[in-house]
Regions:
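Substrate-recognition "cap/lid" segment bordering the active-site pocket of phosphatases
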Residues: 85-88, 114-166, 170-179, 184, ...
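Conserved phosphate- and dinucleotide-binding cores of soluble alpha/beta proteins
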Residues: 297-383
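Active-site neighborhood of HAD-like aspartate-dependent phosphohydrolases
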Residues: 1-44
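Metal-dependent phosphoesterase signature
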Residues: 32, 56-95, 103
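Helix-loop "lid/cap" segments that line or gate small-molecule binding pockets
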Residues: 28-29, 49-63, 121, 152-153
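Substrate-recognition element of Asp-dependent hydrolases with the DxDx(T/V) motif
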Residues: 13, 25, 93-123
Length: 383
């Protein structure tokens, strides 16, 4: 099902506002003789509105309503003048918003930041890419109460079934759950992927480009992929966190010879560093030759995976495809849910129009897809 409406959180989702928030709350509390706050302290205190941020930054013994009001006024005065000093969109976010607009998706923003600041930031950084912005408003409860998000959804003309709510905190996930919306947690913000999952995230995005297929195809159905792949004789294990996946792989590979093809997924899991203490590890970029073709276990990822049970890899030199067909005693594919698509054709499209352009750009290849992110079925010698 295609999604037609997006509701984004602001801080930690669209914009990295941490520096300006930290500077402003430090100004407000230092003015009254209290200790400055660090970036980390600011990060963990964000999410329930600026009053809560200020309150949590005042020492407990001085945390009266009067002092909170005074510091909050100082915070707002300073932040109003400095909210765009260090704030910036997360890399790739503007491109995602542009693509959503081109595809007819209506975008709104809901923030616990006070309304005038939220509107000013959205106007400055995103302009008409966002249709409507709501910040904290008088006499309307803040997130995770669903009142504001349901008002915003109504004004955007969306419906619950085709709307994604996207945010970086437990508050955001709870807001979506309370409103009956699909909750997408972004792992580049101020909270961990584990916290987002525990708070009700239906899916996670680890980089902005992960959001686009969620609008095209909806949230991937892991259970369908499991049924299809096990039906074809594959083993299947699902892990909610990176640490769980690493633990399983370490236990499975302990005492064995292991090799890996070119895989950014495996590098992100810490291969070979996380495995070298208990495993005879070989990586084809470092260890050339036959040994890498005849291990006990071969670890790889895939460019695409389908809910109908197909695994898609497109290789320049066939290092991964060949090793999965011949040589190793056992092959384990390690894939993020972001690679899962409804069917074979959409999995191939992911390989061509997401994986291949990203790899070409990463490897500094001068192919057309490295420029515009779309496969041209080119005859480039660097392909």
């Amino acid at each position: 099902m295609k999604m037609t409406t997006a509701i984004f959180d602001l801080d930690g989702t669209l914009l990295n506002t941490l520096g300006d928030l930290c500077d402003s709350v430090t100004y407000a509390v230092e003015k009254h003789g209290f200790p400055p706050v660090s970036m980390e302290q600011t990060r963990i205190r964000i999410g329930n509105g600026v009053r809560k941020l200020v309150e949590r930054s005042i020492p407990e013994e001085s945390r009266t309503d009067e002092m909170i009001d005074i510091c909050l006024a100082d915070f707002r005065a300073f932040y109003g003048e400095h909210m765009m000093n260090r704030t910036h969109p997360y890399e790739g976010i503007v491109s995602v918003l542009e693509t959503l607009k081109e595809n007819g998706v209506t975008v709104g923003v809901l923030s616990n930041k006070y309304d005038s600041a939220a509107k000013a930031l959205i106007e400055h950084y995103f302009g008409d890419l966002v249709s409507i912005t709501y910040g904290e408003r008088p006499n309307i409860p803040r997130k995770p109460d669903p009142t504001s998000v349901l008002q915003l959804l109504d004004e955007l003309g969306g419906d619950k079934e085709t709307t994604l709510y996207i945010g970086d905190s437990a508050t955001d996930m709870q807001t979506a759950v309370n409103a009956g919306l699909t909750a997408i947690g972004v792992a580049w913000g101020f909270r961990s992927a584990e916290e987002l999952r525990a708070s009700g995230a239906d899916a996670l995005a680890y980089e902005p480009s992960d959001l686009l297929p969620l609008f095209e195809y909806g949230v991937p159905d892991v259970s369908k992929a499991e049924k299809a792949l096990t039906g074809y004789g594959f083993g299947f294990h699902y892990f909610a966190t990176k640490d769980e996946a690493v633990s399983y792989l370490r236990d499975t590979c302990a005492g064995k010879s292991v090799s890996m093809g070119g895989s950014m997924t495996m590098k992100q899991l810490g291969f070979p560093e996380n495995f070298a203490d208990s495993t005879d590890v070989h990586w084809h970029w470092i260890d050339k030759g036959v040994y890498c073709q005849t291990p006990d276990v071969y670890l790889s990822s895939a460019n695409g995976l389908s809910e109908t049970g197909e695994i898609v890899n497109i290789d320049g030199k066939c290092n991964r495809v060949a090793a999965t067909l011949f040589g190793p005693k056992r092959c384990i594919f390690v894939c993020g849910v972001n690679k899962l698509r409804p069917d074979l054709q959409s999995a191939i499209e992911r390989a061509r129009n997401i994986a291949a352009p990203l790899n070409a750009k990463r490897l500094n290849k001068k192919t057309p897809c490295a420029v515009d992110g779309r496969c041209h079925n080119c005859k480039s010698p660097e392909r």
